Every structure is written in structure tokens, then in C-alpha cells.
Amino acid sequence: MQPLYEGKAKRLYTTQDQDVLRIVYKDEATAFNGEKKAEFAGKGELNNRLTSHFFEVLAAAGIPTHFIEQTSEREQLVRRVTIIPLEVVVRNVVAGSLSKRLGIEEGTVLETPIVEFYYKDDSLGDPLVTPAHINLLKIATTEELSLLEQEANRVNDVLRPYFDEKGITLIDFKLEYGKTPAGEILLADEISPDTCRLWDKETGEHLDKDVFRRNIGSLIDTYQTLFNRLGGNGQ
């Protein structure tokens, strides 16, 4: 097992199968493109278990992902993909940068979900980009971009009612996609409270990384609460 890549929240390693990678989830939390950092014992285990569970939920709904299996509390095996340098953000309720950018009050429910694309480049601050920008940058074809939007909406159609049944509102979330050597586009990266905004339907309590971003609560306690609310799934 050789190290391949280390990101803000995960380490990637090769395996004996060239088409399979091992992901190890770290305890580090970051915000504001890495400007704010801290470590929380147990975070990696919680995110691994939650991500594994969400990918299983999506796979059961017929959505193709890179996930193969969870192999330990902190590790999982995934199909090897080349990440498309776009963050695909799906918004159901106004929050975060959308509120600041358009001057709309946080908590405003959108009539229909909004899908946005952000160029994955830390040096540029991951800017919001339009289809014309994406074409200019040669990141994805028009057909691929249409597929990404369609697939992101499919993920939303599965996860939104899933959380709703648990008394949680899926405010917004970030997805990343990658291509297999054969050119198949798969949902990749992770789905966790690091990448989703989740609010308690009754109290409005944040059940995601915003407690760290905004210094409004304990990250580990929040993630553990979410894990428990979902029935302790992820094994």
C-alpha cells in the first residue's frame, strides 16, 4: 500500500489492484479553504462510517458511485477515478455563500433546487463558474456537464427525503465526480457533515461542519449526534 495523495480530510493509497484505492479518513477539520484548521479525535471514523452509509443508500437507489466497501472504522475501498475539477453544489434552502452573494435571508426555501458549479482550485478560492467558463477551461464537455447536473439532482432526490424522515432538512451539499479509465463518470469523494448542511427540522440546530466554521458548538458532539439520529448506521 503506497501513499498516492493527501487532502484536507483524507489520505489515498494504492492497493494490489490498480483500479482500486484505499481511503483513510483523517481527524483534521478545515474551513475557509484551509485557513482555519483543527484536529478532533474520532472525526475520521465518524465521517468514514457516515460516508459509507450514504454511498450504500445511493447505490441501492441505482446511483453509480466509486464506493466498494468499508474495511475498518477509518478506511474504505473505492474504485479509482480521475476527479473532475468541479465542485457540484446542490441547494434546497438559502444558506452560506448564496445568502451573502444574493442578499437573501438564510433559511429561505427554494422553489426548486439550484445546482451550482465551482472550479476546484484552492489558489483561486474555488470560484463559482458558469457553463461558459467550464467550456473555456476545458474541464468538461456540454454533455458531461448536463450529466453532472442530472446526477446531482438524482442524489438530491434520494437524500432529501431520507433526511426528512429523520427530522433533518438537507439545506445544501457538495458533490465531486470522477472518471474511470473506461470513461464512466461516478460519484466520488465523500458525503458527510463536512460536505452537507443539515438542520434539525424543529429547532434549526446545525448538524454539520458549520458548528466549526461559526464556532457555535462541538464538532465531535454534533457529528456523533447526527450519527445517532441516523440510527448509528455506517458499519
From Swiss-Prot:
Keyword presence, S-adenosyl-L-methionine? no
- InterPro entries in the cross-refs: SAICAR_synt/ADE2_N, SAICAR_synt_PurC, SAICAR_synth, SAICAR_synthetase, SAICAR_synthetase_CS
Could you tell me the keywords of this UniProt record? ATP-binding, Ligase, Nucleotide-binding, Purine biosynthesis
Instruction: Look up the EC number in the record and give it.
Output: 6.3.2.6
What GO annotations for molecular function exist for this entry? ATP binding; phosphoribosylaminoimidazolesuccinocarboxamide synthase activity
Catalyzed reaction equations: 5-amino-1-(5-phospho-D-ribosyl)imidazole-4-carboxylate + L-aspartate + ATP = (2S)-2-[5-amino-1-(5-phospho-beta-D-ribosyl)imidazole-4-carboxamido]succinate + ADP + phosphate + 2 H(+)
- Name of the featured protein: Phosphoribosylaminoimidazole-succinocarboxamide synthase
Q: What is the lineage of its organism?
A: Bacteria, Bacillati, Bacillota, Bacilli, Bacillales
Name of the coding gene: purC
